[in-house]
């Protein structure tokens, strides 16, 4: 937890130093002050400070290092993000990324991930995908194995959001292989869940159940109710593909019980829709109508 009093003291010390500085030292102080402003969620102040630093570096011309310039531009990006000006923020990061790429700086990968995550928050999954793919390519050559696997998993997640199911399987399997080398059990279960869901969407019920059960096994051992719920859901989709409707319904009802008090409205909605589908397929239209009525009450509030 951030100690606000300490942060205010740091701000005061930085402001006291400012009149006695110039050039790069002054720009660095502005960047530090911008960071403190972001901690306080003061996006407008942070933006003004980061832009001051950027102007100093521009005035220095060739004397300013590309890394320092990239740092100032990144500060502008974070400030714009704090102001919910996400399009401008991602464009700012593009400038920083170009500078970091030219110098092959280690911060390049983190900045690529940041930009990709911002695109993901906005639902621009194609742009997010491009960032994570580049980060994965860099990490594959000279990066950390764990981060390489995480980038691969992020690529799989983007493909999941784009509905490119074969690619989900390909990249989740690649991530799983690296996670397995690192004995990262929790992360493997998320790979298995995504693989299972992709198989269900591709109408391969057997594989959906196979991979869903793997995720469920780990979740049960870890007493991870979120994963138990989601893996039960994807296995139910697999049983539905195989027209084993009672098995599907049993799993959906179990998932429904687990998610009921969570406030995870998207997952609650998905489960209800699958139950309605099962009721229709088994000609239980009264139950389907009742479930649809309940769901409409929820969706008018949360959507």
Predicted regions and their residues:
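Flexible inter-repeat linkers and adjacent short helices
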Residues: 1-74, 80-85, 97, 291-303
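Amphipathic alpha-helical segments of tetratricopeptide repeats
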Residues: 15-16, 51-61, 94-104, 133-144, ...
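Conserved alpha-helical positions within TPR/SEL1-like repeat arrays
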Residues: 28-39, 67-82, 106-121, 146-161, ...
């Amino acid at each position: 937890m951030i100690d606000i009093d300490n942060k205010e003291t740091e701000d005061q010390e930085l402001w006291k130093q400012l009149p006695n500085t110039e050039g790069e030292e002054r720009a660095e102080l502005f960047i530090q002050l911008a960071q403190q402003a972001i901690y306080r969620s003061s996006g407008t102040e942070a933006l003004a400070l980061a832009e001051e630093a950027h102007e100093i570096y521009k005035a220095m011309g060739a004397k300013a290092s590309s890394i320092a310039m990239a740092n100032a531009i990144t500060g502008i990006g974070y400030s714009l993000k704090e102001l919910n000006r996400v399009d401008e923020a991602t464009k700012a990061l593009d400038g920083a990324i170009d500078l970091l790429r030219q110098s092959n700086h280690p911060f390049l990968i983190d900045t690529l991930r940041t930009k990709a995550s911002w695109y993901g928050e906005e639902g621009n999954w194609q742009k997010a995908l491009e960032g994570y793919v580049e980060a994965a390519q860099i990490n594959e050559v000279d990066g950390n194995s764990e981060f390489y696997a995480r980038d691969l998993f992020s690529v799989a997640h983007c493909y999941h959001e784009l509905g490119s199911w074969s690619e989900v399987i390909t990249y989740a399997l690649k991530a799983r292989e690296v996670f397995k080398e690192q004995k990262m059990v929790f992360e493997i279960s998320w790979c298995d869940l995504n693989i299972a869901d992709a198989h269900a969407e591709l109408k391969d019920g057997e594989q959906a159940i196979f991979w869903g059960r793997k995720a469920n096994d780990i979740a049960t051992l870890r007493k991870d109710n979120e994963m138990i719920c989601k893996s039960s859901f994807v296995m139910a989709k697999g049983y539905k593909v195989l027209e084993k409707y009672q098995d599907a319904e049993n799993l959906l009802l179990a998932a429904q019980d687990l998610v009921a008090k969570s406030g995870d409205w998207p997952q609650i909605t998905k489960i209800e829709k699958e139950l309605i589908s099962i009721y229709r397929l088994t000609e239980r239209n009264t139950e389907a109508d009742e479930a649809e009525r309940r769901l409409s009450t929820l969706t008018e509030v949360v959507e």
